[in-house]
Amino acid sequence: MRINPTTSGPEVSALEKKNLGRIAQIIGPVLDVAFPPGKMPNIYNALIVKGRDTVGQQINVTCEVQQLLGNNRIRAVAMSATEGLMRGMEVIDTGAALSVPVGGATLGRIFNVLGEPIDNLGPVDTRTTSPIHRSAPAFIQLDTKLAIFETGIKVVDLLAPYRRGGKIGLFGGAGVGKTVLIMELINNIAKAHGGVSVFGGVGERTREGNDLYMEMKESGVINEQNIAESKVALVYGQMNEPPGARMRVGLTALTMAEYFRDVNEQDVLLFIDNIFRFVQAGSEVSALLGRMPSAVGYQPTLSTEMGSLQERITSTKEGSITSIQAVYVPADDLTDPAPATTFAHLDATTVLSRGLAAKGIYPAVDPLDSTSTMLQPRIVGEEHYETAQRVKQTLQRYKELQDIIAILGLDELSEEDRLTVARARKIERFLSQPFFVAEVFTGSPGKYVSLAETIRGFKLILSGELDGLPEQAFYLVGNIDEATAKATNLEMESNLKK
């Protein structure tokens, strides 16, 4: 699907002054605007309110048309705070949807929902912009080839592989490592695939956004010396912003990613943290627009809004957008309408477990709960499929035996079950891995493990060849050779102590 990018539109002062409206009512972030007969703006048009407030401060608020109310009035949602606006203020119809800068000049920069840079590094060096509202690519433009997207993270590549051009959900509560996993993926994609990423911070903490930016600069994903060599563009609409901004910031990030796919013909990674906040903002806006809520207070248009965003994230014959979306699960209830609607669009789910995080196993990906539609012999091959299934069976058997072990102890198990438990504990530890972006916490250099190395390592553990090695040798290592080297070092250390 080709974008027809436009050059930046004229300044507001140069807009045709004839299509002017006036504010008739303000309800929080929602404005009712009256226009002259026959001059009604279209749905999704951007409106601009310029003027001065009661103390003489300059006001410049952009809004988006959401409803036509009749009687020459429209209802619009503001993209920034509405403090200082008054009834009777002049509103200019721009005649087009919100447009944001796109292209290579966006890399290494931070934008808000309107595509304005907010990193104090000056204006963006591009005149190419694209509207944030577009239809999904037509069926004939889609690429249907199934291919694995190698991440270099063992637990993901082996047990819940990502699809190139697919959508992946990252499920987890607070503090189990969603953001660290996202940062590692951005780092690995940039270094191993040379691809670009777009990060959409939707309704999350400002502090986290700042930390992410600083850590990206430290890890080299954002190159401060030569900003053009950066591998990621950041778009933030944080928790403190009005619901209009949080509802549209995901589309701003997606529009930037679409340009890299369609015009630059690149494989792009789109991160959305957090897709639940997109739904939450839509729910707030829906209530403000006076719509009747549906189940659990969510907006009646929940499926439509989610679909219009998700269907644009896909592979075309030009390139692909692979999307990784953090999904906050309210009260750990997966049947809540927000996560349940998200599930319908996903090709793979990576579930983070608090239990594994408590054991110190990072990434804390639950190997039994995480799933992928790609884990089929005809896609990944027999060897990968068989190894993954045997790893899951071993871990499942260990899970079943844990109650018996807790009550009676290991000694009461049969010889075969004891062997299964020993191998499962090695597998559990071998699924951990030192991350590049977490070097400051772990003190261990990060490791990228190829899929072939991952499969070889788990096959060796399952075959019983490494039964003699201590389980701590498998903790926080890269490939299996590092585990055997670590075992030798541990043995030498224990001999020295004797």
Curated annotation (Swiss-Prot):
It catalyses: ATP + H2O + 4 H(+)(in) = ADP + phosphate + 5 H(+)(out). ATP binds at G172, G173, A174, G175, V176, G177, K178, T179. It holds the Pfam family ATP-synt_ab. GO terms for cellular component: chloroplast thylakoid membrane; mitochondrion; proton-transporting ATP synthase complex. GO terms for molecular function: ATP binding; ATP hydrolysis activity; proton-transporting ATP synthase activity, rotational mechanism. It is an enzyme of class 7 (translocase). The keyword Ion transport applies. Its EC number is 7.1.2.2. Keywords: ATP synthesis, ATP-binding, CF(1), Chloroplast, Hydrogen ion transport, Ion transport, Membrane, Nucleotide-binding, Plastid, Thylakoid, Translocase, Transport. CDD domains: ATP-synt_F1_beta_C, ATP-synt_F1_beta_N, F1-ATPase_beta_CD. It is found in: Plastid, Chloroplast thylakoid membrane. One of its GO terms (biological process) is proton motive force-driven mitochondrial ATP synthesis. InterPro entries: AAA+_ATPase, ATP-synt_VA_C, ATP_synth_F1_bsu, ATPase_a/bsu_AS, ATPase_alpha/beta_chains, ATPase_F1/V1/A1_a/bsu_N, ATPase_F1/V1/A1_a/bsu_N_sf, ATPase_F1/V1/A1_a/bsu_nucl-bd. Belongs to the ATPase alpha/beta chains family. NCBIfam families: atpD. Produces ATP from ADP in the presence of a proton gradient across the membrane. The catalytic sites are hosted primarily by the beta subunits. This is ATP synthase subunit beta, chloroplastic. It comes from Glycine max (Soybean). The lineage of its organism: Eukaryota, Viridiplantae, Streptophyta, Embryophyta, Tracheophyta.
